[in-house]
Amino acid sequence: MFAAGLAPFYASNFSLWSAAYCSSAGPGGCSFALDPAAVKKPSFCIADILHAGVGEPGPAAEGLVGASAALTAHLGSVHPHASFQAAARSPLRPTPVVAPSEVPAGFPQRLSPLSAAYHQHLPQQPPTQQQQPQQQPPPPPRAGSLQPPTSGTRVVPHHSGSAPAPSSKDLKFGIDRILSAEFDPKVKEGNTLRDLTSLLTGGRPTGVHLAGLQPSAGQFFASLDPISEASAILSPLSSNPRNSVQHQFQDTFPGPYAVLTKDTMPQTYKRKRSWSRAVFSNLQRKGLEKRFEIQKYVTKPDRKQLAAMLGLTDAQVKVWFQNRRMKWRHSKEAQAQKDKDKEAGEKPSGGVPAEGEREERSPSRSEGEAESESSDSESLDMAPSDTERTEGTERSLHQTTVIKASAAGALITASSSASGSSFSFSSSSSLGSSNGSAGSASSLGSNCSELLPSHQPSVTSGPQSPEIAQVPLAGL
């Protein structure tokens, strides 16, 4: 088994040392027989391998030459179309092994066509049959079959039954089509629209084969063949140029250039919302608001129950409560800030009263002062106030001057008359001048009594008798 597995490896890939070194058995042992004298332990020295081609004498060279001759004879019997000559070719220049034309029916599937066990099952062909294909012209080839190679010819497999490959210009995304001006962004989409409309209306452009296209595009165009009304397709094109057929069917065309067109580029920048905003009815909103007043945070069982009652989903109720709590929190913070600002505005006005309060307090104060003054005046009727006292003083001063003058005149006139008349004049003048209150009269008398002695020297300075000076004092 080991020799059978390594024999094709050495024979096909390297051909430097033959597989005969693995075993000396015959054809039944999956190898070929050699001369016992030539059987030797293989030498892996590069010098021996190089000298083997030159043909120097020696046991190693003889063994390698014998092995090459045996390998040539063996491969020549198996492959009649290939000529192996040991003298002309060196083991350093391996000859390619060509697979046979026909495979036997009893050939196991796991064996390689180049293995030794595979070559043992092949029948020996007579030499007359080997030369017959060379003399007679070859028969016409069958579709899908491999032809046996001839000597000196190169095997070129080709499929005669397949359709001819479409040209690069006919393909939708061929090299010539891509490099042409149709993919220039400055060029309009007239050619693309013309090709698509011709395909959609049932007619195909010349040279385009659906079999040559990819299966996805072929199935797409084959399904659109029954459509024959071009007006239904071209009507949105005239109204909205961006709504083109290429924009509608951009995913159906294969290739990386399907999404790099001018119309499809802005489409990538637009963000599509994967969800739509839920619109609640008035009944649902009232039910949610009533539950929110009772309970700001709902548990999962309560949320499911509320959603079932209102005809909503669990996610909708959850999101509504989250948004409602956020709104409630913001309103609460705004109210607290408003109250704080109001308190801060009232604090500086608390120490100093406002103008309105000052005006309100001033009349009350004046009224209180008036009441107190009236009460004082009522309780002290006989006692004059400060103003009355000052007025009385001024009046007394004025009256004293008059009295002085009158007294002086009286005294002057009294100098020749009797003392009684002068006393009566002075008393009458004093009584006539005192028409005010009793306090003013008393103050007048006191003032007169105080002021008369000051004028006494002026009165008495003249040549008067001492009796005249004593008369007003005794009377007053």
Curated annotation (Swiss-Prot):
Polar residues biased stretches: 455-464
Query: Where primarily located?
Result: nucleus
Entry-linked Gene3D superfamilies: Homeodomain-like
List the molecular function annotations (GO) for this entry: DNA-binding transcription factor activity, RNA polymerase II-specific; sequence-specific DNA binding
Q: Name one GO cellular component term.
A: nucleus
Q: Provide the residue ranges listed under DNA-binding region in this record.
A: 273-332
The coiled-coil segments of this chain are none
Does DNA repair appear among the keywords? no
Asked whether the keyword DNA-binding is assigned, the reply is yes
Known InterPro entries for this protein?
H2.0_Homeobox_TF, HD, HD_metazoa, Homeobox_CS, Homeodomain-like_sf, HTH_motif
Listed Acidic residues bias regions: 369-379
What's an example GO BP annotation here?
negative regulation of T-helper 2 cell differentiation
The protein's matches in CDD domains, at most eight in alphabetical order, are given as:
homeodomain
Compositionally biased intervals (Low complexity): 158-168, 413-446
- Enumerate the residue ranges of region (Disordered): 121-170, 328-401, 413-476
- The Basic and acidic residues compositionally biased stretches are 331-346, 355-368, 386-397
Name its cellular compartments: Nucleus
UniProt KW keywords? Differentiation, DNA-binding, Homeobox, Nucleus, Transcription, Transcription regulation
Which family does the entry's similarity section mention? Belongs to the H2.0 homeobox family.
Described purpose of this protein according to its UniProt entry: Transcription factor required for TBX21/T-bet-dependent maturation of Th1 cells as well as maintenance of Th1-specific gene expression. Involved in embryogenesis and hematopoiesis.
Q: What is this protein called?
A: H2.0-like homeobox protein
